[in-house]
């Protein structure tokens, strides 16, 4: 639906509802921001290129902490490393609530580990972290699963014999297979039709969630839900994924051996059985389905997209690729696969991966937070349950922490001696109590997949480096890199 038509519909709705609702009323002492119109909120201040561009422009006028109205609801926007850290770290508990993303809220409805709040969130997060951390005791570790998947990937890339290919599907396959092995207890063949359908649904959904129309939907979900749009396709996609998860749960239930849990679903089912007499338990079927869906979103699409962007950067900056491969040769050699222990001995490669994540800026304003109580912050009072958008992009491009914020520069993460250094502006997984559940697995995957590929292959592009375009194809909730062609040439 065209922006102008959406604007007209929203404006007409505003006129109709004005008599009933009047101007949005602020409570507490919210940070400054543009004056909202009835129902429309700050629509007229929104940039046609999306919410991120809008927020960054408003920051120039109102500073690092300001309020915008998305429709009739106030949202406090945090920009810059310092403001985000003050909120999510220094006042972690107060800012630990989870807000909604309008296009997926009809599916999650506050269930599952990502969008839950209160005791439900605490119980599911504790369980999920413990299960993923402890899973594999006496079996294969997560690192071994990733190494196995990396070997399968190398075999698949060798089959291409240096032909041009789009790496999107393969990179989705490898990251999805890691979560599948943890959640379902199995990996899929790359040509499995059920697996390919799942991958298509996830990729399509992430792209749609990141689209401009989904950002407009965020402004007026109660009104626009009655019209055709991407929100309906997202709902259908996620429902189909949930059906697959539900079928897998039933298969697990039928073959469950309490003395030998095979995977995340088995462990969850055992917890459900243990708590069945407790009516207040959060371990029920709905939370199982939506927590598994959450794990896929947290651990597959984001990591695969980071890898895709990483290799696009390696094509554009071949001198960086050469230096990474030199470090691989010095530390690992060619006769054994990379291991996680190698990372501490490879500061340049680690810095490159950090810089890929920083410049890739995959989730520009994170997943929305809410404050769990009336909260004093920088002289303002943010009322309980107010939504908060931490603009992670503004930290990842913060010139106070990154010397050349808009340029690919691994030196951002290296000290004068060439050792890896911590940078306060680096927060691609967010911060605080809501830091990404899959951070540990994602960091392990990025290192092992990245180094295994460059250990075994040289890469080449059909276009010269200077002509490679890094502009995201979609830029909303997520930044989706453009599709591109690449050759993997066996070394």
UniProtKB/Swiss-Prot annotation:
One of its GO terms (cellular component) is endoplasmic reticulum membrane. Its main location: endoplasmic reticulum. It is found in: Endoplasmic reticulum membrane; Microsome membrane. It is an enzyme of class 1 (oxidoreductase). One of its GO terms (molecular function) is heme binding. GO terms for biological process: epoxygenase P450 pathway; xenobiotic metabolic process. Its cofactor is heme. The modification Phosphoserine is found at residue 128. It catalyses: an organic molecule + reduced [NADPH--hemoprotein reductase] + O2 = an alcohol + oxidized [NADPH--hemoprotein reductase] + H2O + H(+). It is a peripheral membrane protein. Induction: By phenobarbital. The keyword Endoplasmic reticulum applies. Keywords: Endoplasmic reticulum, Heme, Iron, Membrane, Metal-binding, Microsome, Monooxygenase, Oxidoreductase, Phosphoprotein. It holds the Pfam family p450. Its EC number is 1.14.14.1. Heme binds at residue 436. Cytochromes P450 are a group of heme-thiolate monooxygenases. In liver microsomes, this enzyme is involved in an NADPH-dependent electron transport pathway. It oxidizes a variety of structurally unrelated compounds, including steroids, fatty acids, and xenobiotics. In the epoxidation of arachidonic acid it has a unique preference for the 5,6-olefin. Belongs to the cytochrome P450 family. This is Cytochrome P450 2B4. It comes from Oryctolagus cuniculus (Rabbit).
